[in-house]
C-alpha cells in the first residue's frame, strides 16, 4: 500500500489532471484527504480550494465534470497524476487546458 505524504504541503497533495485520450495536461489543483476520498468514491474529480478553504467538485457549476480513469503517484508520494475523460473545458476561462499561455509571452525558448 502506498502512503501519501500529506505533511510536506500542510495536508495537501499537488494534483496534475491530464486528458486520458489526448494526454494534454488540463490543470493543476490540490487535494486533501477528504477530496481524494470523494474522488475515489464518486469517480469524479474533487479538490480542495486553497482560497475558499472548501471542497470543490470540478464541473459542479459549469457541467464540465471530469470522470476519473486512473490515479498515479509520483516517486516522492507527494503528487498525483489523475487521468480523466473531461466533459468540457478544464479552465474557468473556457479554454480546454489551463495551460494556454506561454512565458515569456509569445516566445519559444529554443
From Swiss-Prot:
Pathway: Amino-acid biosynthesis; L-histidine biosynthesis; L-histidine from 5-phospho-alpha-D-ribose 1-diphosphate: step 3/9. Mg(2+) binds at residues 74, 76, 78. Homodimer. Coiled coil: none annotated. Keywords: Amino-acid biosynthesis, Cytoplasm, Histidine biosynthesis, Hydrolase, Magnesium, Metal-binding, Zinc. It comes from Lacticaseibacillus casei (strain BL23) (Lactobacillus casei). InterPro entries: PRA-CH, PRib_AMP_CycHydrolase_dom, PRib_AMP_CycHydrolase_sf. Its EC number is 3.5.4.19. It is found in: Cytoplasm. Pfam families: PRA-CH. Binds 1 Mg(2+) ion per subunit. GO terms for molecular function: magnesium ion binding; phosphoribosyl-AMP cyclohydrolase activity; zinc ion binding. It catalyses: 1-(5-phospho-beta-D-ribosyl)-5'-AMP + H2O = 1-(5-phospho-beta-D-ribosyl)-5-[(5-phospho-beta-D-ribosylamino)methylideneamino]imidazole-4-carboxamide. Belongs to the PRA-CH family. This is Phosphoribosyl-AMP cyclohydrolase. Its cofactor is Mg(2+); Zn(2+). Signal peptide: none annotated. GO terms for cellular component: cytoplasm.
Amino acid at each position: 500500500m502506498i502512503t501519501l505524504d500529506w505533511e510536506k504541503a500542510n495536508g495537501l497533495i499537488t494534483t496534475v489532471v491530464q486528458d486520458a485520450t489526448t494526454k494534454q495536461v488540463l490543470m493543476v489543483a490540490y487535494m486533501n484527504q477528504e477530496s481524494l476520498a470523494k474522488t475515489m468514491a464518486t469517480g469524479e474529480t474533487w479538490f480542495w480550494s486553497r482560497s475558499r478553504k472548501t471542497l470543490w467538485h470540478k464541473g459542479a457549476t459549469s457541467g464540465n465534470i471530469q470522470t476519473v480513469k486512473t490515479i498515479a503517484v509520483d516517486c516522492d508520494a507527494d503528487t498525483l497524476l489523475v487521468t480523466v475523460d473531461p466533459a468540457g473545458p478544464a479552465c474557468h476561462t473556457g479554454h480546454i487546458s489551463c495551460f494556454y499561455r506561454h512565458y515569456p509571452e509569445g516566445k519559444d525558448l529554443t
